Amino acid sequence: ALARRKTGAVVIFSAGFAEGGAEGLAQQEEIARIAQAAGMVIEGPNCLGSINYLDRVPLTFVDTDISAEQAAFNRAQPNIAFLSQSGAMMAVVARSLADRALPLSFAVSTGNEAASTIEDYLEYALQEPSTRVLALFAESFRHPQRLLAAARRAQELGKLMVLLHPGKS
Protein backbone atom coordinates (compact mmCIF):
# COMPACT_ATOMS: atom_id res chain seq x y z
CA ALA A 1 0.00 0.00 0.00
CA LEU A 2 2.81 2.44 0.84
CA ALA A 3 4.58 1.72 -2.45
CA ARG A 4 1.37 2.42 -4.38
CA ARG A 5 1.13 5.75 -2.56
CA LYS A 6 4.72 6.49 -3.64
CA THR A 7 5.95 6.75 -0.07
CA GLY A 8 9.64 7.61 -0.23
CA ALA A 9 10.83 6.18 3.07
CA VAL A 10 9.58 3.90 5.84
CA VAL A 11 10.88 2.90 9.26
CA ILE A 12 9.86 -0.64 10.28
CA PHE A 13 10.37 -1.04 14.01
CA SER A 14 8.71 -4.48 14.22
CA ALA A 15 10.75 -7.61 14.85
CA GLY A 16 9.96 -11.15 13.75
CA PHE A 17 11.38 -11.04 10.26
CA ALA A 18 14.69 -12.64 9.14
CA GLU A 19 15.79 -13.16 12.74
CA GLY A 20 12.61 -15.17 13.40
CA GLY A 21 12.99 -18.00 10.92
CA ALA A 22 12.02 -19.00 7.39
CA GLU A 23 8.58 -17.36 7.33
CA GLY A 24 9.95 -14.08 8.66
CA LEU A 25 12.83 -14.21 6.19
CA ALA A 26 10.36 -14.66 3.31
CA GLN A 27 8.37 -11.65 4.54
CA GLN A 28 11.53 -9.56 4.80
CA GLU A 29 12.60 -10.55 1.28
CA GLU A 30 9.17 -9.50 0.00
CA ILE A 31 9.55 -6.12 1.73
CA ALA A 32 12.97 -5.72 0.09
CA ARG A 33 11.55 -6.61 -3.33
CA ILE A 34 8.72 -4.07 -2.99
CA ALA A 35 11.10 -1.38 -1.74
CA GLN A 36 13.53 -1.91 -4.60
CA ALA A 37 10.77 -1.86 -7.22
CA ALA A 38 9.29 1.33 -5.74
CA GLY A 39 12.62 3.07 -5.09
CA MET A 40 11.67 3.24 -1.41
CA VAL A 41 14.16 3.63 1.42
CA ILE A 42 13.41 1.26 4.30
CA GLU A 43 15.09 1.43 7.69
CA GLY A 44 14.77 -1.90 9.47
CA PRO A 45 12.88 -4.02 10.13
CA ASN A 46 13.76 -4.85 13.72
CA CYS A 47 15.30 -1.47 14.46
CA LEU A 48 14.89 1.45 16.87
CA GLY A 49 14.82 4.05 14.11
CA SER A 50 17.10 7.05 13.81
CA ILE A 51 17.73 10.53 15.12
CA ASN A 52 18.82 13.51 13.04
CA TYR A 53 20.26 15.82 15.69
CA LEU A 54 21.05 18.59 13.21
CA ASP A 55 17.47 19.08 12.03
CA ARG A 56 15.77 17.91 15.26
CA VAL A 57 14.10 14.88 13.68
CA PRO A 58 13.78 11.86 16.00
CA LEU A 59 12.28 8.94 14.04
CA THR A 60 12.38 6.65 17.04
CA PHE A 61 10.58 5.82 20.24
CA VAL A 62 13.85 6.18 22.17
CA ASP A 63 13.62 9.09 24.61
CA THR A 64 15.44 12.05 23.13
CA ASP A 65 15.32 15.76 23.79
CA ILE A 66 16.81 17.96 21.10
CA SER A 67 16.31 21.65 21.77
CA ALA A 68 16.84 24.27 19.09
CA GLU A 69 19.92 25.36 21.01
CA GLN A 70 21.28 21.82 21.08
CA ALA A 71 20.71 21.39 17.34
CA ALA A 72 22.51 24.68 16.63
CA PHE A 73 25.39 23.60 18.91
CA ASN A 74 25.63 20.24 17.15
CA ARG A 75 25.69 21.89 13.73
CA ALA A 76 28.35 24.43 14.76
CA GLN A 77 30.75 21.83 16.17
CA PRO A 78 32.65 19.00 14.53
CA ASN A 79 30.27 16.18 15.38
CA ILE A 80 29.77 12.43 15.48
CA ALA A 81 27.53 10.19 13.39
CA PHE A 82 26.81 6.90 15.17
CA LEU A 83 25.60 4.09 12.91
CA SER A 84 24.64 0.80 14.51
CA GLN A 85 23.18 -2.52 13.47
CA SER A 86 22.06 -2.90 17.09
CA GLY A 87 19.16 -0.78 18.27
CA ALA A 88 20.16 -1.13 21.91
CA MET A 89 23.70 0.05 21.17
CA MET A 90 22.37 2.99 19.16
CA ALA A 91 20.18 4.09 22.06
CA VAL A 92 22.82 3.62 24.77
CA VAL A 93 25.76 5.15 22.90
CA ALA A 94 23.78 8.11 21.55
CA ARG A 95 22.44 8.89 25.03
CA SER A 96 25.92 8.51 26.53
CA LEU A 97 27.46 10.87 23.97
CA ALA A 98 24.69 13.42 24.46
CA ASP A 99 25.03 13.21 28.25
CA ARG A 100 28.72 14.06 27.84
CA ALA A 101 27.84 17.09 25.67
CA LEU A 102 29.54 15.53 22.65
CA PRO A 103 27.83 16.88 19.54
CA LEU A 104 26.00 14.40 17.34
CA SER A 105 24.77 14.65 13.79
CA PHE A 106 23.01 11.31 13.41
CA ALA A 107 22.27 8.16 15.39
CA VAL A 108 20.96 5.32 13.25
CA SER A 109 19.79 1.81 14.06
CA THR A 110 19.81 -0.17 10.81
CA GLY A 111 18.15 -3.32 12.13
CA ASN A 112 17.89 -6.22 9.68
CA GLU A 113 18.76 -4.01 6.70
CA ALA A 114 16.04 -5.35 4.40
CA ALA A 115 16.49 -2.57 1.85
CA SER A 116 18.99 -0.04 3.26
CA THR A 117 22.33 -1.09 4.70
CA ILE A 118 24.83 0.43 7.08
CA GLU A 119 26.90 1.30 4.00
CA ASP A 120 24.01 3.46 2.71
CA TYR A 121 23.86 5.41 5.97
CA LEU A 122 27.64 5.72 6.07
CA GLU A 123 27.74 7.20 2.56
CA TYR A 124 25.01 9.67 3.56
CA ALA A 125 26.75 10.69 6.80
CA LEU A 126 30.01 11.26 4.90
CA GLN A 127 28.26 14.03 2.95
CA GLU A 128 27.40 16.07 6.06
CA PRO A 129 30.13 18.75 6.30
CA SER A 130 29.93 19.12 10.09
CA THR A 131 30.31 15.38 10.73
CA ARG A 132 33.96 14.72 11.58
CA VAL A 133 33.72 11.28 13.22
CA LEU A 134 31.89 8.27 11.79
CA ALA A 135 31.42 5.64 14.48
CA LEU A 136 30.04 2.25 13.45
CA PHE A 137 28.84 -0.74 15.47
CA ALA A 138 28.47 -3.54 12.94
CA GLU A 139 28.46 -7.32 13.06
CA SER A 140 28.59 -7.74 9.28
CA PHE A 141 28.75 -5.80 6.03
CA ARG A 142 26.60 -6.62 3.03
CA HIS A 143 28.74 -4.48 0.72
CA PRO A 144 32.35 -4.60 1.98
CA GLN A 145 33.72 -2.85 -1.12
CA ARG A 146 31.43 0.11 -0.44
CA LEU A 147 32.63 0.15 3.17
CA LEU A 148 36.25 0.29 2.01
CA ALA A 149 35.44 3.02 -0.52
CA ALA A 150 33.71 5.02 2.24
CA ALA A 151 36.74 4.57 4.49
CA ARG A 152 38.99 5.91 1.73
CA ARG A 153 36.61 8.84 1.19
CA ALA A 154 36.56 9.59 4.92
CA GLN A 155 40.36 9.67 4.91
CA GLU A 156 40.38 12.03 1.90
CA LEU A 157 37.95 14.34 3.72
CA GLY A 158 39.97 14.25 6.95
CA LYS A 159 37.18 12.49 8.82
CA LEU A 160 37.82 9.82 11.42
CA MET A 161 36.14 6.45 11.12
CA VAL A 162 35.87 4.09 14.07
CA LEU A 163 34.48 0.57 13.79
CA LEU A 164 33.47 -1.75 16.60
CA HIS A 165 32.98 -5.21 15.12
CA PRO A 166 31.68 -7.42 17.95
CA GLY A 167 31.27 -10.61 15.96
CA LYS A 168 28.30 -12.87 16.60
CA SER A 169 25.65 -12.10 19.17
Which residues make up each language-model segment?
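Catalytic-core regions of core metabolic enzymes
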Residues: A1-S169
